[in-house]
């Protein structure tokens, strides 16, 4: 039998309880966006811009401003977060630094006005009104169901973690100095109006956050006001600053961000070590020792550089001919830290298998495909040097919504299964998404076929038709 990566409840496969069904609709929702699928959601989010146009002309290239005069969309945006929400959330135990920051831009520098310990709404409101401070609320999708719904769809669409922050800024004030981020940014204006100024990047597609002094950024490439219902996108590295104009009401905007450390360079760093390890098993040249005292050289000798270049060409040639799934810590990290499937409620209820137990003549189909990754790697349970490769299936069905995007200091668990490498073809049959009869799975025995189906069913990864 395959083994679980992490125990996830009762392992008695013959017993079942009603499955906790994921709900796709919020009751009495104001939503004017299309949540039918990740693709339809993103299409409705950037409407009237076509998706093809967005990725061809704007994504990672230049900002996109979408200004709308749509009262229903403006009302929906306003429903996503408000100052009254902040009052109710403070009663749940918010802390400075972890959940909220209070800050103001003074003389081109960020001044943090946080207190210690728990955040009280009256103190936050006092700083907001009297000190004209911006209140930054971290990762509101932990508390607001509709933001969970939005970001879960976006994580499915991009295949990358999606975070968010809410910024509440009083009139005549600015929270942050000019800076650029290491993420792709979508701005949704929820309440009031905000003046945005964007500048050409000094570091295109930046990998780090950085504050830029006013004398370095030049003149704005864009200067405009956002109003409720408007959407702004800009690539990582875009220098920006935003302020609420004097004489107007306060402003609230939502920042949705994605694609942090999600470049080709990151993927290469993630996959190259496994590739070298595999090829070194077959190529004795990679197992020969380095020249004596090479690590003691101040500079790398030319012959060593040529040797390394030759090894890299060998790796490239070997990579092109490989069809095997590459082990990837990026895959594991994504599924481990992303949001669970959206459902109404607090999101902490575990999902349990329900319905018919799959048998040899049953027809099964994969579910929650966007929440599952399949990868091949060495068996971590083997301590000997000759580790056998196994297939790992990781999923996010039992992830904790409350810890989403809260940093590495929060302990997270990884859920899933591991199977012998001989199961990979049968798993690919199921992963295509079409219904498949259990007895038609590409495995050697009927017992293996049924065990595979039951194991996936126990984790709610397949259902019986």
Swiss-Prot record:
Asked if Oxidoreductase is a keyword of the record, the answer is yes
For this chain's record, the cofactor binding note is: Binds 1 Fe(2+) ion per subunit.
- For the protein in the UniProt heading, the enzyme class is oxidoreductase
Q: Which Gene Ontology cellular component terms are annotated?
A: cytosol; nucleolus; nucleoplasm; nucleus; transcription regulator complex
Q: What is its EC number?
A: 1.14.11.79
The family database entries (Gene3D superfamilies) matched by this protein are listed as: 3.90.930.40, Cupin (2.60.120.650), JmjC domain-containing ribosomal oxygenase (ROX), dimer domain (1.10.10.1500)
Q: Which domain of life is it from?
A: Eukaryota
Localization per record: Nucleus; Nucleus, Nucleolus
Q: Which reaction does it catalyse?
A: L-histidyl-[ribosomal protein uL15] + 2-oxoglutarate + O2 = (3S)-3-hydroxy-L-histidyl-[ribosomal protein uL15] + succinate + CO2; L-histidyl-[protein] + 2-oxoglutarate + O2 = (3S)-3-hydroxy-L-histidyl-[protein] + succinate + CO2
- KW GTP-binding (keyword) present: no
Boundaries of every JmjC domain copy: 139-271
> Any idea which positions bind Fe cation?
179, 181, 240
- What protein family is recorded? Belongs to the ROX family. MINA53 subfamily.
Q: What is this protein called?
A: Ribosomal oxygenase 2
What is the protein's species of origin? Answer: Rattus norvegicus (Rat)
Q: Which gene encodes it?
A: Riox2
């Amino acid at each position: 039998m395959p083994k679980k990566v992490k125990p996830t409840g009762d392992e008695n496969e013959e017993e079942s309880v009603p499955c906790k069904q994921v709900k796709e609709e919020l009751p009495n929702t104001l939503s004017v966006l299309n949540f039918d699928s990740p693709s339809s959601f993103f299409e409705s989010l950037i409407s009237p811009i076509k998706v093809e146009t967005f990725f061809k002309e704007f994504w990672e290239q230049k900002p996109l401003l979408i200004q709308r005069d749509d009262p229903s969309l403006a009302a929906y945006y306003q429903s996503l977060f408000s100052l009254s929400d902040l009052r109710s959330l403070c009663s749940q135990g918010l802390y400075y630094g972890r959940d909220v920051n209070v800050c103001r831009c003074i003389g081109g520098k960020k001044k943090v006005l946080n207190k210690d310990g728990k955040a009280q709404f009256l103190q936050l409101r006092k700083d907001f009104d009297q000190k004209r401070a911006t209140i930054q609320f971290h990762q509101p999708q932990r508390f607001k169901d509709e933001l969970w719904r939005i970001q879960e769809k976006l994580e499915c669409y991009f295949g990358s973690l999606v975070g968010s922050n809410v910024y509440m800024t009083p009139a005549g004030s600015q929270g942050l100095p000019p800076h650029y981020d290491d993420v792709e940014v979508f701005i949704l204006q929820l309440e009031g109006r905000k003046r945005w100024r964007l500048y050409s990047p000094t570091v295109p597609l930046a990998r780090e956050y950085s504050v830029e002094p006013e004398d370095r950024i030049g003149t704005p490439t864009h200067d405009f006001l956002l109003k409720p219902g408007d959407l702004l996108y800009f690539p990582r590295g875009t220098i920006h600053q935003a302020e609420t104009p004097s004489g107007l009401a306060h402003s609230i905007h939502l920042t949705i961000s994605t694609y942090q450390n999600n470049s080709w360079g990151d993927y290469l760093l993630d996959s190259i070590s496994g590739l070298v390890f595999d090829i070194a098993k077959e190529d004795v040249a990679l197992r020969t020792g380095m020249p004596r005292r090479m690590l003691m050289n101040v500079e790398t000798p030319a012959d060593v550089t040529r040797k390394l270049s030759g090894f890299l060409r060998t790796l490239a040639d070997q990579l092109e001919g490989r069809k095997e799934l590459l082990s990837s810590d990026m895959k594991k990290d994504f599924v481990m830290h992303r949001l669970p499937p959206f459902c109404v409620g607090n999101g902490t209820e575990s999902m349990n298998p329900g319905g018919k137990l799959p048998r040899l003549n049953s027809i099964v189909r994969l579910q929650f495909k966007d929440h599952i990754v399949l990868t091949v790697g060495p068996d971590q349970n083997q301590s000997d040097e000759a580790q056998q490769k196994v297939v790992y299936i990781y999923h996010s069905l039992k992830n904790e919504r409350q810890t989403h995007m809260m940093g590495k200091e929060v302990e997270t668990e990884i859920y899933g299964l591991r199977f012998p490498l001989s199961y990979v073809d049968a798993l690919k049959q199921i992963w295509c998404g079409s219904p498949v009869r259990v007895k038609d799975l590409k495995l050697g025995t009927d017992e293996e076929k049924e065990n595979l189906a039951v194991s996936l069913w126990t984790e709610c990864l397949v259902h019986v038709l």
